[in-house]
Structure formats: C-alpha cells, structure tokens
Amino acid sequence: DALPICWNLREKEEKQILENRAKGIDERVSLRSRYVKILRNDINYIDLKEIRTYPFWNQRSNRSGLIAEERNARKKPFGNLANRTVGSVYKDIEKGGASGLELKYDSLLRGVPGVKYRQKIQGKWMDVVEEPAKEGWDIVTTIDADIQDIAERALNRKLVETEAESGTAIIMEVKTGEIKGMVNLDRMSNGNYAEGNPNAFSYMNEPGSTFKTVSTMIALDDGVVTPTDSFYVGTGLYQYNKRWVRDHYWRRGQDRGYLTITEGMELSSNIVMSKMVLKGYEDKPEKFIDGIDRIGLRKQLTWDVPLNGIEGTSAIRYPNDKNNYWSKTTLPWMSFGYETQIPPIYMLMFYNGIANGGKMIKPFIAKKFVENGK
C-alpha cells in the first residue's frame, strides 16, 4: 500500500506547490530539520482523517511522527438556511451547543476530549497529540435545502405583505413524518424578519377555524351527528348564555336558514360548530375533551428542537379542573378554536394524519446518527 499512499501525498503536495508559486510563494523545507512539512497549512479535516488511516501514520504521534496543528472553525455551507433549527454553539467550546439540534444532541455531537502536550519544534510551539480525541457523532437531518429555501422566501414575503409580528411554515412528508422544511421568523428591532424562537413547537396560540375539523370528527365519531344533519344559523348571529356567536357574514343580514354539517364546514360556520357540540356534550363536556385526547392533541411530546423550558404542549382545559376555570361558554367557543392554545406542530400532525389515511405520525428532524462515517 505504500506506493499509492506516497503517490497520493505527492499529488497533494505538487498541487500546493503550484498554488504557492502562482501566489509568488516559494517555500523550502530544510532537510536537516528533524521535522519536515509534507502538506500545506490548510488541509481540511476530511483529508487529515484519510491520512491518519494510512499504515504507520495510523498510530499515535509519538510513534508515527505525524504532527497536525489543528485549527477549529465553524462553517455554514448554506449560510443562515435553517439557522435556528440547526442551532448554534457557544464561543467557549467547552459549553457545547447553545440552541437547536446542536443543543438537543450536544452529548452526541461533542465527542470525548483527547490528551495533548505542547512541544517546541523549529522554534515554534506545536500541539502533540498523546491520546486522540474521540469524534462526536454526525446527524443526518430530514431538511431539504431547496424546500427550506423556498419556504423561507415565501414566508418572508407573506410576513412583509401582512406586516405580521411573526410566522411559521412547516413542510412535512405525509407518510414518514420527515420535516423537509421549517421556518420560524420574528420581526426584529430593525423591522426585518429573521429566525427567532422555535414557534412551530412552542407558540401557544388559539387555532381558530382549523380546529373545526377536530370538533366535527369527534362529533361524527361519537354518533352525535351525521354529515347531513342541519342546524339553524339564520343571519349569522346566535346568542348563548348572554354571549353572541357570530358567523363571518353576520353584518350582511342575509338569512341562510339551515346549514348541514357538511355545509357548515364548507362555510366555516361558528354557529353550526357550537350547536353541534352543545347537542352532544352540553351536559357532559368532559366527553368532548376525551375525544380530543383520542386524537392526541393533549398528549405531551418531546421534539428534536429544545424549547428553553417551554414544554410546547397544548393547553386545553378539562371540566372540573380547579386550576383552569371552565365556564358555560367554554365548550361552544372551544368548538370553533377559541379558549384553547395549541402549538402549530400539533395541528400539522393532526391534518397530516387525515392526509395519511387516519394514521398520525410524530414529525421529526433528526433522521440518522452516524459514528465514524457509518
């Protein structure tokens, strides 16, 4: 194996000599020195790993004589793409990951420190490795760079257009749960949008009309209604317990009469939703919450992205819970997505379950963990 190894090194060295001459540099190495520089100063880590697999040089430095002066630098080949998801590390390497995947899987990524001492060579102090450090694992993510780029640009345009404070976009593979792109943008102090908090997992927000599908599925599953059952909506105003439920067209004064469950979904009718759940659960609201539990929207889940102390679990009240007040209007308002707080990732998981034929899959970002390239 010696001939191809030496030839490989010769090619690398000749290439560097030509590059140096093109820059007007003519470096000469003293053959009388005990140590000889065999490669350029800035070979990458992949090449160094390859060299250390060669016979003789795969031993400790005190046996092989191979001394490599390492310089650590963090590089982002895709710039700020998926910056928050990938995460960051502290300037102090000992502290490890600071956010994102870097923080979540810090114990795997950081590896095990080695042992080295410093020796003066040709008037210059150099690090000599006594016990090589053990490399950390590599993470293969589900993120598709092209999809991520498109998602970031699209979300940024929409936020600028609507002058919103923040926004989240998530693209998920239906069958597998792989997140192909995820963007969390917040408005910064300068007015521009940039990656901020992991809102996809932690932003507690009322889901609004997206929750109407949940209410309808529970009522259908419990046999409370059928798709053809109808409720009177009139001009879009319905009073319950001295509070008004309004449909979006109520200002027009148009009398729509009765709407079926199907029509109520098509028109996103708050009145149909509220009357539907009151019919089935007014006297036993806990049964409606049990239906939410069957779907899994109150289940506490862990994610690939650390939430800085925020659990990111849905805040959906339960009747008779002394810590959370349950009023007479909680149930009907909950039916159309109010009086609940659900992170976006939960609603994504729910709708993905519908697209996946009823099978709900937990979204994930870390696809594979690789040790030593395997």
Question: Which residues fall in each region the model found?
Answer:
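Envelope-exposed proteins and targeting segments
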Residues: 35, 64, 81-84, 135-139, ...
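Conserved, well-ordered alpha-helix/loop/beta-strand core segments that scaffold catalytic motifs
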Residues: 36, 124-167
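Small/polar-residue-rich segments within soluble enzyme cores
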Residues: 4-135
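Soluble periplasmic/extracytoplasmic beta-strand elements of cell-envelope proteins
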Residues: 38-40, 67, 84-88, 140-142, ...
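Beta-lactam-recognizing serine transpeptidase/beta-lactamase-like catalytic domain environment
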Residues: 2, 118-130, 143, 169-208, ...
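Amphipathic, well-packed alpha-helical segments that form the structural scaffold of globular domains
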Residues: 106, 110-113, 121-122, 140, ...
